């Protein structure tokens, strides 16, 4: 399984590290290139765009701030859904409005892409202790 991860902040960063450390082939993308620096030498690869990340991944994880960020990444220029394949899965770890998740899910389903609404709780310490609560 090839994993793509977007959202390398205080919550998503440790999650992405855990995926990389778990040995999964992982592709990362960040709006701010400096967010990728902690992953140099880890085995993770870096995508030039969300579209490139989508094409390199079977599962794409989003851990971004909110509804507008999720929509922008899903449908915007270089949008994930346009470049993901049927059978792929989009996992939304962001805390977003249920209507946003339904909207993304409907558009994804039309392309054969699954969406999992999986917000997380516990922060970086829980990730590092491998005790992150995922509400799926």
For the regions a protein language model found, what residue spans apply to each?
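Short alpha-helix adjacent to the SAM-binding motif of class I
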Residues: 38-39, 72, 103
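Rossmann-fold dinucleotide-binding core
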Residues: 3, 95-136
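Rossmann-like NAD(P)-binding element
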Residues: 47-99
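Short beta-strands and strand-loop turn motifs
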Residues: 29-31, 92, 117
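Short, well-ordered alpha-helices that flank and scaffold nucleotide-derived cofactor binding pockets
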Residues: 17, 21, 75, 106
């Amino acid at each position: 399984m090839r994993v793509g991860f977007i959202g390398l902040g205080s919550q998503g960063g440790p999650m992405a590290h855990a995926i990389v450390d778990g040995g999964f082939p992982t592709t990362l993308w960040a709006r701010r290139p400096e967010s990728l620096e902690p992953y140099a030498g880890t085995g993770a690869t870096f995508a030039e765009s969300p579209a490139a990340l989508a094409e390199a991944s079977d599962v794409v994880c989003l851990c971004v701030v909110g509804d507008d960020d999720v929509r922008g990444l899903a449908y915007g220029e270089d949008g994930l859904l346009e470049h993901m394949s049927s059978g792929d899965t989009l996992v939304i770890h962001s805390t977003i409005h249920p209507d946003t998740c339904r909207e993304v899910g409907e558009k994804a389903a039309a392309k054969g892409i699954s969406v999992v609404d999986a917000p997380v709780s516990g922060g970086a310490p829980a990730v590092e202790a491998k005790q992150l609560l995922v509400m799926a």
